[in-house]
Design a protein with these regions (language model features):
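Short, positively charged and aromatic/hydrophobic N-terminal segments
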Residues: 9, 14-22, 27-31
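Catalytic-core regions of glycoside hydrolase
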Residues: 45-48, 147, 159-319
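Conserved residues at the C-terminal ends of beta-strands
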Residues: 47, 76, 152-154, 296
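Short connector loops/turns at beta-strand edges and beta->alpha or beta->beta junctions
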Residues: 78-81, 154-158
Length: 490
């Protein structure tokens, strides 16, 4: 990449781009001096791949966001065809009416309503017609009352059309030009528009673990209008932790504090589970180093109450997971009303605690469930354990107790009045029930002290519940250990 200012090689005919829209290093403070005057933007982004939420669910999410003490909802489902695949197309009358209702509902709750556009799959950055198409999209949204926008350039190859190769010094410079041009257009239409930008290198992993050395991020930091916020997911797409030092580092490169796109509770990459536990791996000390945090949660709407409310607790400075969870569960309990109960009976807090423990976080099980799994590992650590030992028998009983609690929870969930809530967890609870039942059946067999060399009589002891299919076959080729690392064997 060249050392001169980003715009230096651009054709003079590119509308909206001039030396006035680039920024030299000395014009912005280093971190220590990154812009700090903005209020923290906090809330939820519907930014996942897969089936989007319904209009009614989005209206309800606004209540959750307000109830959690946050201030923003970002409408950006990846598979809304007019956000990404057909980004040039404006919304029809019915779609526009729903967006207007969301804008008004957000305003009534004193929330920001932000709409994302991802002009990244086939955009020609130097093509005037593509910039005009983006402006038409923005103008329609402005007419609907939207003043907060996100332009997303994530999850795409770092390649450009031939015309862009001739027009721009780099891929990043093309995105800077396109985004700054859109922002200038918005500033001519409305006072104080808010724009967030999602870079293609949106985590340290995509910058090859060398954030200060990333030419792409350096160009974004130097060229992007300083009023435009930049999304960042942390060290990884889904980050186990986000440290203060890492945020200082990316802040220095971007010349602004990042807005965290929080994927901790996302599950669009793993269809086998939901993340219903509290936000973790983040300390309150990072709040002074960011301009915002929006959580991109589970596809299953009803699984997100605890994630949203514990995220709200975190941005208020509560970084003790157990404390945030304990506050969220009673607020969630009313959604678990049993049908035909007459007296508004709901599931107990102990049942909700187990539900969360079984569907906890991306990097660990719930504490109680993990302790019981550790006991199960010890029970199975020998081919033929001493099943007469008091410790073995006690552990066996505890695993049986876990099975019984999961069975009971599953049965109670089938009686919920809120069927969307039931279906959000049904496949995961079904699998948990089946697998722990098989575990107990195996432990029961071991407790009978079968002779060495005897095979477990699976056809007699359990139902034929054996998971197959293409994905499982591929996983068997490259099994992973507990940390997720691959291996292979012949």
């Amino acid at each position: 990449m060249r050392d001169e200012p980003i715009a230096s090689s651009l054709p003079p005919g590119l509308a909206g781009w001039s030396m006035d829209t680039t920024f030299e290093a000395g014009e912005r403070p280093d971190l220590g001096g990154v812009v700090t005057t903005k209020p923290l933007l906090t809330g939820v982004i519907e930014g996942f791949y897969g089936r989007a939420w319904t209009h009614q669910q989005r209206l309800e999410m606004l209540d959750w966001i307000a109830g959690a003490g946050m201030n923003t909802f970002v409408y950006g489902p990846k598979d809304d065809i007019k956000i990404r695949a057909r980004w040039r197309e404006t919304y029809n009358a019915a779609e526009a009416a729903e967006l207007r209702e969301l804008v008004e509902a957000a305003r009534a709750r004193r929330l920001n309503f932000m709409v994302a556009i991802a002009p990244c799959l086939d955009v020609v950055y130097s093509e005037a017609s593509d910039l005009d198409a983006l402006k038409r999209r923005l103008d329609q949204l402005l007419r609907l009352g939207v003043t907060h926008f996100a332009l997303l350039f994530d999850d795409i190859p770092s390649t450009m059309a031939a015309a862009d190769e001739r027009a721009f010094d780099s891929f990043a410079a093309a995105q800077v030009y396109f985004t700054n041009s859109a922002f200038e257009h918005l500033k001519g239409q409305v006072e104080h528009p808010v724009v967030l930008f999602c870079p293609t290198e949106y985590c340290a992993a995509f910058a090859k673990r060398d954030v200060p050395g990333s030419a792409y991020l350096k160009t974004i930091g130097e060229g992007l209008d300083p009023e435009i916020g930049v999304f960042w997911t942390g060290p990884d797409i889904v980050s186990k932790s986000i440290s203060a030092d890492s945020l200082r580092e990316i802040g220095r490169v971007l010349r602004r504090k990042p807005v965290i796109w929080e994927n901790f509770h996302a599950n669009d990459y793993d269809i086998r589970r939901v993340m219903a536990g509290p936000l973790g791996g983040r300390k309150a000390e990072i709040l002074g180093l960011i301009d915002g945090l929006v959580t991109n949660p589970n596809n299953e709407f009803e699984a997100n109450f605890v994630p949203v409310h514990t995220t709200g607790a975190f941005v208020r400075g509560v970084d003790v997971e157990a404390e945030a969870l304990a506050a969220a569960l009673p607020a969630w309990q009313g959604r678990f009303r049993l049908a035909f109960s007459g007296d508004n009976q709901v599931l107990g807090l102990d049942e909700l605690q187990l539900l969360v423990e079984l569907n906890y976080q991306p990097f660990r099980q719930g504490p109680e469930v993990e302790a019981l799994l550790q006991k199960a590992r010890r029970l199975l650590s020998e081919e033929r354990p001493d099943v007469g030992a008091a410790d073995w028998q006690a552990g066996h009983r505890e695993i049986i107790g876990l099975r019984d609690r999961i069975r009971h929870l599953f049965e109670r969930m089938t009686e919920l009045e809120n069927r969307d809530l039931f279906y959000a967890f049904h496949p995961y609870l079904w699998e948990a029930r089946e697998e722990v039942t098989h575990l107990v059946a195996y432990l029961d067999w071991l407790s009978e002290a079968p002779p060495k060399g005897t095979e477990f009589p699976d056809k007699e002891r359990i139902y034929n519940f054996y998971r197959r299919g293409f994905s499982v076959a591929v996983q068997e080729l490259l099994p992973r250990d507990a940390s997720g690392k691959y291996r292979h064997h012949m």
